[in-house]
Amino acid sequence: MRIRMNAPTFDHVLIVASDLERSIEFYTLIGFEHLETIQRPNDRVAVMRLGGVKVEIMNLPEGEETLREPRRLTDLGFRHIGFKVYDLTSVYERLKDKISFDSPPRKIQGRGNRMTVFFKDPDGVEMHFVQE
C-alpha cells in the first residue's frame, strides 16, 4: 500500500502522569528510550520513543485535579496500548518482579498461537504485550 504525500502519518501519543519521574522510570523499564524532558511554563513533558513511535508524558500541572474512573471493555474511545514482543515469556520473566501483571501470559481465544499479558502504568493506563 502506498502512502500519499499529503496523507497524515502517526506522530505521537500524550499521556498525563501524576509523577513524571516515576513514569519515565516505568516506561524506560518496559523498553522506551527517554529522548528529552521539556520544561514549559506550567508543566514538564518527557519525550519517549519506542521503535519509531513517540509518546509524550506530561506531568499533571500543579494544582490541577484529575478524575480516573475504571474503564469497562465496552466504553467508547481509547482502551489500551499494545506492544508487540518476540518472546513474551522472557519479557514477562524479566519484568514480573518490577511491574504488576494481571496474569501470566495466556493465549488469546480464536487468534491461533497469539499470546498476551496485560498490565498498567503507574497511573492506571492499560497496556499489554502481545506475541504473534
Region annotations inferred by a language model:
Residues M1-M5, P70:
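A detector for short, charged/polar N-terminal pre-domain segments
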Residues T9, N42-R44, G51, G77, ...:
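Exposed loop/turn and edge beta-strand positions of beta-sandwich/beta-sheet ligand-binding modules
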Residues I15-V55:
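Core segments of cupin and vicinal oxygen chelate
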Residues A17-E21, D75-D123:
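Vicinal oxygen chelate
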Residues D43, E64-E69, P104:
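A short, acidic/glycine-rich surface segment
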Residues M48-G52, F119-P122, E132:
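Active-site beta-strand termini and strand-to-loop segments that position acidic
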